Amino acid sequence: AAKEEAVAAGRPEAWLFTPKRTSFTPVLQYCENRELRKELLMAYTTRGNHDNENDNKDIIVKTMQLRVEKAQLFGYTNPADYILADCMAKDAKTVDAFLESVWEPSLKAAKREAKELQKLLSQDLPGEKLQPWDWWFYTEKLREAKYDLNEEELKPYFELNNVRNGAFQLAHELFGINFEKLEGMPVYNPEVEVFKVTYADGSLVGILYTDYFPRAGKRPGAWMNNICNQYVDANGVDHRPVIINVGNFNKPTQGNPSLLSMDDVETLFHEFGHALHGLLSKAT
């Protein structure tokens, strides 16, 4: 993927790594060059923060001011209370209390992990302190030392299509629904695939789009969206939903399939769970 990025950028002699998670994460995990790890992580964490024409600080301040104004127009003190009003937590105070309850045990666990990672770092670089760009690299070393497990060795078992088919099979076993790939459907990008979802009797559950690969202009991360919501109209007709799962997994290259990390597998199943929520909705 890094070679293809370089070719696309007009540098066929090079390898191009970018501040995208799918690009720089393997570098942070496996690159022995500490300075390169630092450079990539800093490039990622300081995006939009260089006091130039692409700087976002003023935009963020303005965005937050507008969110506060919007919340107050609706009678709420802050944006968090406004957003949470129809959620289980109800308000920011409840969320803060929950976060406080997990803070101490989480901090203890993080310090315990950092201590183990520092030991490994000290073996390689005596006198150096653990830094953010060391964390993933030495986590991989610790995993190999403790469990003789290299995440890269797991990836061939998690080819993207196999993982997605596994998710479909699980949904079939749990809910009795089937997934049929549809060819020739209108899509906004050639990489997008479309599936018709039906019950055992052939009745329509909904339509699922999947858009799994990064590309220029696409937002990072993974999410589910409703393209068309499920609803029952005034005549009692149930309109079935159109749902999309979006990800940014490693794109297959010439002769090489898209192989997922364990974290990627969890992400795919997580977003597929949201898709099932949307597909199986029978709200009025």
Name every feature range the model reports, one short phrase each:
Residues 48-50, 217-219, 264, 275-276:
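Signal/transit-peptide handling
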Residues 23-29, 49-55:
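A ubiquitous short alpha-helical element
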Residues 1-18, 29, 61, 66, ...:
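Active-site-proximal, well-structured secondary-structure segments within enzyme catalytic domains
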Residues 52, 56, 156, 160, ...:
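Alpha-helix N-cap/helix-initiation motif
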Residues 68-75, 171, 251, 256-281:
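Active-site recognition of the HExxH zinc-binding catalytic motif
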Residues 30-47:
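Short, charge-rich amphipathic alpha-helices with coiled-coil/heptad character
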Residues 36, 48, 52, 69, ...:
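Surface-exposed loop/turn segments and immediately adjacent short secondary-structure elements
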Residues 1, 283-284:
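Short, intrinsically disordered, charge-balanced linker/junction segments flanking boundaries
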